[in-house]
């Protein structure tokens, strides 16, 4: 944040709540302190049914199902000019080129690809999910294959849940 704030005036910081490990908890505390010192409004949004700071899990599942069944917000963001932020740790040109050449053996990226995997899961591949999930070879062809899309934020857990729920 400090390096970005040297290039831009930051008034608001937007992020989503996550559950993680001690490292991410400590990071969040440091971000909160930084925002307080610099008078930055930090807006954290709930995502994937995460409940932070609960004393126990009583009622957690009910809250999760309510969250998963709530309407999905439609993204109306329009393309803006890219923001140029100079990295204090620039990549070597050769490594940057390698990273820009997306390997064909990887799952295709993006939201459309995520929904294609979900569609193939509910229309056939998922039929043997319970039987094959613990089998290394068979699980590749019967599991959802949506982890990368969830990890990179191409789709949300709520979108995946509602898709499977509505197609079952």
Model-derived segments and spans:
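Catalytic cores of enzymes that engage adenine nucleotides and/or redox cofactors via long glycine-rich
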Residues: 73-168
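Beta-rich, aromatic/charged-enriched effector core domains that present basic-aromatic interfaces
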Residues: 1-114
